[in-house]
């Protein structure tokens, strides 16, 4: 079986484990249980591997590794050495009796207690600052798991048994990370509108990340920043497009603690070193972060909540992020507040990509003044119109805006990718081919009929700094011209068909009315049904031929 099939098998097995919780709570809730337990198993299996590696012991199964751990931990001298090694290499520690493998053994002998798992969670959370409160969203005693402690125990036991069948130690960090990302996407699909707070569709993530990394694939020590990071998927795509991904540093902030915990797990499952991730929980607009070095970044990637309300207090006019613009984003729409925050933290040589609703391109008043200021600075490099209905939390079309600080030109490239999608079951889907077409237009920076236009600054000024894409990219498709003789022939043919159908209908109506009381009495239900059919057929025929337009 090839790696692709292995990955798909792992994805499906992990998703099937959700069946145990599905129906007890919605996807937005049960994702914490499944993802949290997968992460606990990952940490546990990784610990057993580290123990055996440091003891220079080989093993054939996790159960054998568990026995080696228990035996050596019982020796006081070996125990102290192991604790030092685990703290140094992993940054966390799990008691031998609380590893995932040990919990499975307890489940099989009916000795498992929820407190065992709860204690394991606490041990990890207290072992290192980076794990603090990591499992706080997993309520092992929730009534949604079952009405009694016994029922709750049974559900968690079943989930532990299901996940134990998967040997996560057989997969490298990228496969596990991708599997985790797959699950997050599946949860987003199941969660619908609730998903917007934690997930950016992979196609959009790939497009934005590739743009940020264009020409910098081999740059070492790249710094990336996402102040509305959700699950961290935008940041983590750097592992695909950087040739020096092990040197990339990730900076992210998230206001929702549950989503923040999800991002932390996602980072670690993707193999991002602890020293390369600086994640923070907080309100991006109300309290700027980071405020200590580094405060500007090579790449800024953002998919903020759309048209969200914010305080917009006049005091923000003195905030370095907004002060040079003279106005603030409207209190009812924080879109430009998020954009200016990200742009403030962009290096002079950096690239920023942000997803926003189309309204930011043309709304007036304060937003127009901010837009004008950015355009006069040459900050707006490219505007890409995405298809409608590609996000889980909204069906509206969105736009990706690319910003830079070191441009010498004020022109703007417009790309209308609104038709670049395939129809999916619930959402429209952008494929690799669609993304490649957009990237080519972005790199070529030339006009493409009905797809892209490079607008001069003078053209934008003439449009009063309105960046609405249809003003610059004409996608109108003209109807083919039909010769008058051909049109006349079609009309004559249609008239003949209408006349024939009318005659048939009149004959049927004549049968329906009857000429004598006796004839009327002979009408049958079959006659009525047949006449109704002809009436309906006639109406459909008229509609098809445009008689109701």
What is the predicted role of each segment?
Residues 41-51, 187, 216, 242, ...:
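A generic secondary-structure signal for well-formed alpha-helical elements
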Residues 194-302, 307-316, 322-325, 336-337, ...:
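Conserved S-adenosyl-L-methionine
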Residues 263, 524-539, 545:
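N-terminal amphipathic/hydrophobic targeting modules at extreme N-termini
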Residues 1-212, 275-284, 385-388, 410-418, ...:
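Non-catalytic, mostly N-terminal accessory regions of nucleic-acid modification and defense proteins
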Residues 5, 286-287, 292-525:
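A conserved structural/catalytic subdomain of Rossmann-like adenosyl-cofactor enzymes
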């Amino acid at each position: 079986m090839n790696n692709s099939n292995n990955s798909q098998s792992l994805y499906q097995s992990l998703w099937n484990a959700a069946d145990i919780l599905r129906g007890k709570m919605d996807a937005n809730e049960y994702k914490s249980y499944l993802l949290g337990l997968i992460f606990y198993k990952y940490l546990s299996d990784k610990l057993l591997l580290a123990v055996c590696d440091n003891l220079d012991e080989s093993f054939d199964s996790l159960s054998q590794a568990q026995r080696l751990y228990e035996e050596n931990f019982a020796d006081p001298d070996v125990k102290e050495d192991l604790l030092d090694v685990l703290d140094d290499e992993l940054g966390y520690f799990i008691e031998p009796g609380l590893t995932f493998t040990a919990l499975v053994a307890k489940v099989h002998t009916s000795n498992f207690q929820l407190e065992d798992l709860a204690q394991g969670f606490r041990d990890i959370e207290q072992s290192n600052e980076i794990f603090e409160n990591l499992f706080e969203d997993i309520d092992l005693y929730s009534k949604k798991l079952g009405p009694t402690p016994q029922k709750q125990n049974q559900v968690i036991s079943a989930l532990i048994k299901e996940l134990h069948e998967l040997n996560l130690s057989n997969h490298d960090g990228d496969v596990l990370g991708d599997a985790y990302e797959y699950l997050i996407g599946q949860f987003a699909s199941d969660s619908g509108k609730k998903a917007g707070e934690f997930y950016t569709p992979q196609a959009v993530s790939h497009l934005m990340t590739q743009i940020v990394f264009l020409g910098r694939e081999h740059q070492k020590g790249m710094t990336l920043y996402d102040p509305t990071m959700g699950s961290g998927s935008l940041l983590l795509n750097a592992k695909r497009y950087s040739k020096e991904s092990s040197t990339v540093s990730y900076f992210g902030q998230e206001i929702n603690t549950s989503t923040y915990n999800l991002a932390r797990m996602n980072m670690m499952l993707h193999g991002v070193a602890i020293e390369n991730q600086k994640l923070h929980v907080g309100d991006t607009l109300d309290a700027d972060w980071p405020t200590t070095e580094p405060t500007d970044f090579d790449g800024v990637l953002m998919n903020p909540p759309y048209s969200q309300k914010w305080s917009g207090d006049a005091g923000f006019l003195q905030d370095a992020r907004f002060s040079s613009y003279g106005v603030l984003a409207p209190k009812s729409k924080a879109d430009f507040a998020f954009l200016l925050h990200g742009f403030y933290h962009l290096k002079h040589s950096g690239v920023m990509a942000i997803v926003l609703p189309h309204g930011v391109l043309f709304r007036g008043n304060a937003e127009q003044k901010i837009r004008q200021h950015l355009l006069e600075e040459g900050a707006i490099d490219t505007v890409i119109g995405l298809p409608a209905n590609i996000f889980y939390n909204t069906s509206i079309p969105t736009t990706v805006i690319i910003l830079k600080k070191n441009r010498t030109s004020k022109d703007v490239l417009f790309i209308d990718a609104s038709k670049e999608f395939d129809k999916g079951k619930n959402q429209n889907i952008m494929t690799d081919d669609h993304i490649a077409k957009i990237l080519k237009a972005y790199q070529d920076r030339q006009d493409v009929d009905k797809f892209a236009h490079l607008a001069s600054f003078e053209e934008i000024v003439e449009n009063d700094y309105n960046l609405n894409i249809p003003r610059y990219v004409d996608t109108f498709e003209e109807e083919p011209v039909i010769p008058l003789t051909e049109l006349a022939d079609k009309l004559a043919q249609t008239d003949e068909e209408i006349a024939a159908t009318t005659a048939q209908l009149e004959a049927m109506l004549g049968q329906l009315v009857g000429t004598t009381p006796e004839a009327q009495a002979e009408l049958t239900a079959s006659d009525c049904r047949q006449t109704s059919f002809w009436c309906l057929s006639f109406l459909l025929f008229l509609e098809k031929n445009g008689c109701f337009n």
